[in-house]
């Protein structure tokens, strides 16, 4: 009996070590893939597809039939989702201001990604603002890594709660 315990405790098959390494390598390749996708995304629909994909990968949740609209809203609103609807309304004016001030597609895409992810999480049933801000950060960190602008922006927004 002691021999069996010793054997099981100290024996680590090489296959298990390789499986762990593959999982880490796969996560790094996913981070690179998502970073490349968000940096190259053209238009709101491209970013919207990344939002849905990263939320599904991170939380295992998705919602069909969501519609994205653009409207000119007050500047204190990035976007909104009215509970009970399939609509997310993105503030076109605010996005245009960020675009003209930064002149950086990468920053605009990160900004739009963060706002849409936030509202999509509300649409999935997460009502608490502080919970949603934390989830946006967690999803961003998992999918884009700690050093990407998406995660940096999500971190700043999370600190406001």
Give residue spans per PLM region.
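Hydrophobic (often cysteine-bearing) scaffold residues that line and stabilize catalytic clefts
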Residues: 43, 47, 109, 113, ...
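N-terminal low-structure segments adjacent to metalloprotease catalytic domains
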Residues: 1-30, 34
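Long, hydrophobic, amphipathic alpha-helical segments used as structural scaffolds
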Residues: 55, 59, 124-128, 147
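Active-site recognition of the HExxH zinc-binding catalytic motif
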Residues: 110, 114-126, 133
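Extended low-complexity intrinsically disordered regions
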Residues: 32-87
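Post-HExxH zinc-binding segment in Zn-dependent metallohydrolases
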Residues: 127-161
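Active-site scaffold of zinc-dependent metalloenzymes
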Residues: 69-109, 113
């Amino acid at each position: 009996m002691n021999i069996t315990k010793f054997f099981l405790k100290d024996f680590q098959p090489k296959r298990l070590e390789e499986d762990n390494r593959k999982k880490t390598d796969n996560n790094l390749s996913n981070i690179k893939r998502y970073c490349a996708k968000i940096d190259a995304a053209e238009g709101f629909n491209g970013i919207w597809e990344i939002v849905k994909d990263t939320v599904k990968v991170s939380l295992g949740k998705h919602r069909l039939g969501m519609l994205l609209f653009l409207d000119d809203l007050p500047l204190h609103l990035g976007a909104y989702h009215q509970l009970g609807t399939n609509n997310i309304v993105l503030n076109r004016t605010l996005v245009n201001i960020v675009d003209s001030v930064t002149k950086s597609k990468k920053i605009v895409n990160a900004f739009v990604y963060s706002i849409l992810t936030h509202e999509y999480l509300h649409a999935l049933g997460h009502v608490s603002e502080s919970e949603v801000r934390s989830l946006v950060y967690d999803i961003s960190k998992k999918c884009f890594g700690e050093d990407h602008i998406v995660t940096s922006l999500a971190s700043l927004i999370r600190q406001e709660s």
